[in-house]
Amino acid sequence: MTQAVLKELAKAELHCHLDGSLSLPAIRKLANMADIILPSSDKELRKYVIAPAQTESLVDYLKTFEFIRPLLQTKEALRFAAYDVARQAALENVIYIEIRFAPELSMDKGLTASDTVLAVLEGLADAQKEFNIVARALVCGMRQSSHKTTKDIIKHIVDLAPKGLVGFDFAGDEFSYPTDSLVDLIQEVKRSGYPMTLHAGECGCAKHIADSLNLGIKRMGHVTALTGQRDLIKRFVEEDVVAEMCLTSNLQTKAASSIQSFPYQELYDAGGKITINTDNRTVSDTNLTKEYSLFVTYFGTKIEDFLVFNQNAVKASFTSDSEKDTLLHKLQENYDSYLK
């Protein structure tokens, strides 16, 4: 399977962080808007915004995001950033993407949570008008933040669903702030009416996945701690949970110490619902075409598998049922030309 074919395949992505996926030209434009001086060469800039191929840990990997934070403190910046990430996705035939971000990371200079969400939604709408893509937004609560901060954010965004906000996630330092410390916040999100996905098992603890299952979470990000957990995988599959897999990112953060310790094959063999995602296009120096290529190389993934993974993504997405039907039809049409 050539890179050209992989790029042309229609794709759906569920797990993509806004602040970790800005293109270098976008970062330069955002810095100019914020009067922040950047290194003059892209080679130097990449050292600040792309994590090393091997970091010490997830926490080490997350430090890269601090460089971007000052660039995303105005509505104009957030609107342009959202447009930029959706544009990048559209250029590799991503027909549906959910882009997630944490409002509190853009509230340093006076924006409210609803200000940040509305700005991101405007940027996604701009991209949808210009490119052949459906782009939706998820809000992330930060695990390490106070529960009061997160509850205030939930309160501010509760009425934004009609404008294109479709769901909620908790991201950040999973090791220090495990799933069972978020129970009251997860219940608060559920009461708000937003569907949820959850980072789970990225830091190597299978209990966090089990706890998420106990809370009724039906989509989970990373789930690398499933490796070698036969009973948990069985339960994961039986409960029809969808895995948002992020191979390059997990190898970088040592969530998976090697290809062999990545849970894809075990989950695939068990009949699990898999989706392929970038996590952070820039921080991990990747895109979906590169991720698909890695799956072909390491796991022998075939075109018919990619069709199923993308169908999984659309069906598990938080968009409307009518939108899902349209997207599933587009997927089938695209893949039919390769599966004849």
Swiss-Prot record:
Paste the cofactor note: Binds 1 zinc ion per subunit.
Entry GO MF terms: 2'-deoxyadenosine deaminase activity; adenosine deaminase activity; zinc ion binding
- Keywords from the UniProt entry: Hydrolase, Metal-binding, Nucleotide metabolism, Zinc
So which cofactors does this thing need?
Zn(2+)
**Reaction equations catalysed:** adenosine + H2O + H(+) = inosine + NH4(+); 2'-deoxyadenosine + H2O + H(+) = 2'-deoxyinosine + NH4(+)
For this chain's UniProt record, which GO biological process terms are given? Answer: adenosine catabolic process; hypoxanthine salvage; inosine biosynthetic process; nucleotide metabolic process; purine ribonucleoside monophosphate biosynthetic process
User: What GO cellular component entries does it have?
Assistant: cytosol
- SUPFAM superfamilies for this protein: Metallo-dependent hydrolases
Where, by residue number, does substrate bind? Answer: H17, D19, G172
* Sites marked Important for catalytic activity: H222
Enumerate the residues binding Zn(2+).
H15, H17, H199, D279
The Swiss-Prot or TrEMBL record describes its family as follows: Belongs to the metallo-dependent hydrolases superfamily. Adenosine and AMP deaminases family. Adenosine deaminase subfamily.
Q: What is this protein called?
A: Adenosine deaminase
Q: What is the lineage of its organism?
A: Bacteria, Bacillati, Bacillota, Bacilli, Lactobacillales
